[in-house]
Amino acid sequence: MKQPRLLPALLLALLMLLPAGCGTQTTGTPQQTSTPTETVTASGAAGTLRVQVPDGWKYEVCPEGTLDDSEACFGVKIWPDSGSDSCVQLYWSDSFGVCGMGLKEETLTLAGDSVSTGYYDGDKNWTFLSYQGKNSGTVAWTDPNAPWFAAQGEQMLAVLDTVEWEPAA
């Protein structure tokens, strides 16, 4: 009598275990996007910043003195969702600093280098990325509550994985 009940229970257990072994594994490095892209370049006295922006995303090149950080800052504002007011400001700064109150930092690898990733007040989404190594001085800043984060946060990290900084000669 117990045998007819055992088979459905085994099948149910097997079905519950299958999804755990499938899918993509998160390794701390975003997956590359296969969407066609455009190379966006921002230049200033300190050098040149490049990033690959997917087709369909909005961007604005910001010359020196047009961003909030300092007069020397320049970069690109990137909107993954054309209907959103919230963007990522990707820029080079000679004086980036943050307040430590409520800050938790983790390290990612993007564009072949270590990146300090800042989360404030328990947010699950990052507020800033500060590149080290060959891309040192490059910063990405955004609103961690932006509506596009849920659907396009990983794709944004893939875009930020394409950052290239070339210091002036």
List PLM regions with ranges.
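Hydrophobic helical h-region of N-terminal Sec-dependent signal peptides
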Residues: 10-16
